[in-house]
Amino acid sequence: MESFVAMKVVCILFLFVVAAEAASTKESPAVNPSKGKDRIKFNFPRYVPNHHVFASNLLKLCTEYTPETQARNDGSQATYKPRINDLQVNFKNCTFLCKREFGNVTLNLPVDTPCGPNKQTCADKSKCVGHIPGC
């Protein structure tokens, strides 16, 4: 059980590194799915079509978010990169947790994000349903 948890943590960290690098390129913000046997499994619902692309897009939103109250960088390079967690995506409220160096922030999912098995999207949050992991 402990090795499974450790492996999941390693996989999630690997995803963040790959997604952050892909998000930093101007050509494509999406992470291409792995072609090997080491595919990362996300806890997103089945109605989200491409979990890797979805996670990459959330990471891009998190990276690009700049709060108005945050002071501009003084030119020094920060080693902390923004992060997301697949367990902190709320499909009922169409939000996700963005972990930042200067504190965490809850951001809205894009309006075209699926939020239910019957083609509901975050454009109409009142029709969204909560995700039950494993279902």
UniProtKB/Swiss-Prot annotation:
Q: Secretion signal: which residues? A: 1-22
Q: Which InterPro entries match?
A: Salp15 (IPR021971)
GO CC terms, sorted: extracellular region
Which Pfam families does the record cross-reference, listed alphabetically?
Salp15
**Glycans attached where?**
N93, N104
Name its cellular compartments: Secreted
**Protein name (record):** Salivary protein 15 Iper-1
Say which species the protein is native to. Ixodes persulcatus (Taiga tick)
Instruction: List the top taxonomic levels of the source.
Output: Eukaryota, Metazoa, Ecdysozoa, Arthropoda, Chelicerata
